[in-house]
Amino acid sequence: MKKILIFIDWYTPAFKAGGPISSIYNLTHFLEEEINFYIVTSNKDLNSKKELHGIKTNAWQQINKSKVIYLDERSQNQKMLRKIINEIKPDKIYL
């Protein structure tokens, strides 16, 4: 199966950013039987200082059939993003 790596500022259970969160969630849910999705996002909601409830920070976890990593601010850097890309070896990257 093809691998797609998605970088998005906020992802479920975040909700304050609205449409983009829903769009990526629906895209991955609709195509999860055909594509392996890996999502890199932040561990806070839009304009929030609190970590999202119910997530693990800086660790991959399963949301439906997608793998998601919620990064804290310290881990949102070029070195970490390069490490993730090299680890996943995606067929495509969605920015």
Predicted regions and their residues:
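A short alpha-helix capping/helix-coil boundary motif
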Residues: L5-I8, W60-Q62, N86-I88
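Conserved nucleotide-sugar phosphate-binding/catalytic loop shared by glycosyltransferases and other
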Residues: N47-Q76
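Alpha-helical elements of Rossmann-like donor-binding domains used by nucleotide-donor carbohydrate transfer enzymes
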Residues: N26, M80-K83
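N-terminal subdomain of nucleotide-sugar transferases
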Residues: M1-H53
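Conserved donor sugar-nucleotide recognition element shared by glycan-biosynthetic enzymes
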Residues: P20, N77-Q78
